[in-house]
């Protein structure tokens, strides 16, 4: 009887081990988008402050990504104040540039935006608005589609940007990849003024690479999730839309199976 029980425990242990080894990776993180932070706006300041507290209260979040329109007016003073608040986060955070974030004639170019980010040491120094980072076996690629000379609501991913993206997708071909950007290439709803220029070319590019599992975006101030050719396109609502909320995303990859992606909108309680 004793030997029988030992065999049962051995078999159970082997099953548990095999199940555990089959799971290639799991990660849980938050997406905050379209904060539109403004100076002298008590509501927006309070929303962002309470959002930071909410994010800090969740120990299971690996990091936070802000997917553009972090500030409402492209001025250094506004960006500095925004950074002052999000520096209270107790976990790593990453920034994407949106159409409200930069305006070269106003004195806040993409180059200067990146310089200010690097001054605050939010994460490792970056060379430009396009960059990558790794977390728990996943690769995240930040892709810039904003225009700094004449900012506008139409997203524009330059050829050199897409060429750079393709290089990264080849480089990280053995990793599950999540792309983070401001302008979606699969819109949550039809709004011509917010469309992305030649989105079909971008889609064709990622369709060539099996490692892309999701694309995160904002811009539309709307919640939307669509699957296209095996890639999960996630668009999240603006933080300042009533009720204020951000999105928690959990991704589980299992060998031999399609990735499982779970999302949850987390409401921010304003006190």
Outline where the language-model segments fall:
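Bacterial N-terminal signal peptides
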Residues: 8-18
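Short acidic, glycine-rich surface-loop motifs adjacent to enzyme active sites
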Residues: 170-189
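Bacterial N-terminal signal peptides that target proteins for export
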Residues: 1-9
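Surface-exposed cleft-lining segments at the edges of enzyme active sites
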Residues: 38-39, 69-71, 146-157, 186-191
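Short, solvent-exposed aromatic-acidic interface loops
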Residues: 262-271
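N-terminal active-site segment of His-dependent metallophosphoesterases
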Residues: 20-81, 128
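Active-site neighborhood of phospho(di)ester-bond hydrolases with catalytic His/Asp-centered motifs
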Residues: 31-33, 63-69, 93-99, 143, ...
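Extended active-site neighborhood of metal-dependent phosphoesterases/phosphodiesterases
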Residues: 76-166, 171, 201-211, 225-261
